[in-house]
Amino acid sequence: MAENLYRARSRVYSPSVLFLHPDMGIGGAERLVLDAALALQEYGCDVKIWTAHYDPNHCFIETRELSVQCAGDWLPRSLGWGGRGAAICSYVRMVFLALYVLFLSGEEFDVVVCDQVSACIPVFKLARRRKRVLFYCHFPDLLLTQRNSALKKFYRAPIDWIEEYTTGMADRILVNSQYTASVFKETFKTLSHRNPDVLYPSLNIGSFDLAIPEKIDDLVPKGKQFLFLSINRYERKKNLPLALRSLVQLRNRLPSQEWDKVHLFMAGGYDDRIPENVEHYKELKKMVQESDLERHVTFLRSFSDRQKISLLHGCLCVLYTPSNEHFGIVPLEAMYMQCPVIAVNNGGPLESIVHKVTGFLCEPDPVHFSEAMEKFIHKPSLKATMGLAGKARVAEKFSADAFADQLYQYVTKLV
């Protein structure tokens, strides 16, 4: 990073950059926005973040190093009825936020970086002093929802059109993986002439290097030796039941004396304002009870960074269960902490994990996952060898320096 600071001082001019993000909570998208903002700030840019929701008690601690402003949190997140209408409410919140920033905030900036919701882009493009816009597409939003009824299809049609049209208004489009780039091209037919650039998320290595793992004795039940860890938000699309079903299959593969030493930590982002988080947590708890896994599973909701680092240090491996994941920052965190990863063999993990070197890429079924889990129990040296390979891969391919330099080049070319 010292080299970055030297380069920043040597520049005559660095642009002013404003980030626009729907909700600065705790998730992969928020981690990327935060890392991007910190990287540009270190390169000498004047950086500000504006968001529709920010809770200092439910966010990454590094947000305190940045100027984070909030507007529009009074607007509804959904139309009620179990979270229905969340998409249109998100669009309204982001358009309001863009209008507020442009006309009421007094902010001066050269480039806008926005992500997740593209509906705000026209506000900046149609302003009297048009702003240059960089849009980071984590994944086409229209693919993240079900259309199980004619009413839902009718509701989504204009939203999907707005997403595609406004995404095309960005001056530059970035995606998080080659996989997402291919899906982008297949999904947005009218944008076939646009070729998004791939900017892999980076890992904030400094925070991991400085952290001292704590003892996890208070978290680990007595007698447990073979510890596994699942890290993901409490959302159904993350396929968390796969981890529990894999645990059931593992029980069938092990003698009772070994099974008694097995424990799984189900950890991840949880927000009681989000109905799906609350509902899915209850579903998983019920599944644990019905599968007779109470003595083998511990749920951790919105656990701290220190707890995460300590668990990654103490567990045999991470179970990463989402299918067709856009990229996934969790495998990078695990590999850098020398904790191998068992992941589904599609989507982003194909670009981050090397099969049988830094972890295992498996079919998304409990049998294959449990087979990989058993390997770590019966061959303890696997964690050490795969862990070293994983850390080396993250340092080589997903370094913060490479991410920062590439992002800075994209931003400065817009000015």
From Swiss-Prot:
Pathway: Protein modification; protein glycosylation. Its EC number is 2.4.1.132, 2.4.1.257. One of its GO terms (biological process) is protein N-linked glycosylation. Disulfide bonds: none annotated. One of its GO terms (cellular component) is cytoplasmic side of endoplasmic reticulum membrane. Belongs to the glycosyltransferase group 1 family. Glycosyltransferase 4 subfamily. Coiled coil: none annotated. It catalyses: a beta-D-Man-(1->4)-beta-D-GlcNAc-(1->4)-alpha-D-GlcNAc-diphospho-di-trans,poly-cis-dolichol + GDP-alpha-D-mannose = an alpha-D-Man-(1->3)-beta-D-Man-(1->4)-beta-D-GlcNAc-(1->4)-alpha-D-GlcNAc-diphospho-di-trans,poly-cis-dolichol + GDP + H(+); an alpha-D-Man-(1->3)-beta-D-Man-(1->4)-beta-D-GlcNAc-(1->4)-alpha-D-GlcNAc-diphospho-di-trans,poly-cis-dolichol + GDP-alpha-D-mannose = an alpha-D-Man-(1->3)-[alpha-D-Man-(1->6)]-beta-D-Man-(1->4)-beta-D-GlcNAc-(1->4)-alpha-D-GlcNAc-diphospho-di-trans,poly-cis-dolichol + GDP + H(+); a beta-D-Man-(1->4)-beta-D-GlcNAc-(1->4)-alpha-D-GlcNAc-diphospho-di-trans,poly-cis-dolichol + GDP-alpha-D-mannose = an alpha-D-Man-(1->6)-beta-D-Man-(1->4)-beta-D-GlcNAc-(1->4)-alpha-D-GlcNAc-diphospho-di-trans,poly-cis-dolichol + GDP + H(+); an alpha-D-Man-(1->6)-beta-D-Man-(1->4)-beta-D-GlcNAc-(1->4)-alpha-D-GlcNAc-diphospho-di-trans,poly-cis-dolichol + GDP-alpha-D-mannose = an alpha-D-Man-(1->3)-[alpha-D-Man-(1->6)]-beta-D-Man-(1->4)-beta-D-GlcNAc-(1->4)-alpha-D-GlcNAc-diphospho-di-trans,poly-cis-dolichol + GDP + H(+). It is found in: Endoplasmic reticulum membrane. Keywords: Endoplasmic reticulum, Glycosyltransferase, Membrane, Transferase, Transmembrane, Transmembrane helix. It holds the Pfam family Glyco_transf_4. It is a single-pass membrane protein. GO terms for molecular function: GDP-Man:Man1GlcNAc2-PP-Dol alpha-1,3-mannosyltransferase activity; GDP-Man:Man2GlcNAc2-PP-dolichol alpha-1,6-mannosyltransferase activity. Residues 1-84, 106-415 are cytoplasmic. It comes from the Eukaryota. It is an enzyme of class 2 (transferase). This is Alpha-1,3/1,6-mannosyltransferase ALG2. The gene is Alg2. Residues 85-105 dip into the membrane without crossing it. InterPro entries: ALG2 (IPR027054), Glyco_trans_1 (IPR001296), Glyco_trans_4-like_N (IPR028098). Mannosyltransferase that operates in the biosynthetic pathway of dolichol-linked oligosaccharides, the glycan precursors employed in protein asparagine (N)-glycosylation. The assembly of dolichol-linked oligosaccharides begins on the cytosolic side of the endoplasmic reticulum membrane and finishes in its lumen. The sequential addition of sugars to dolichol pyrophosphate produces dolichol-linked oligosaccharides containing fourteen sugars, including two GlcNAcs, nine mannoses and three glucoses.
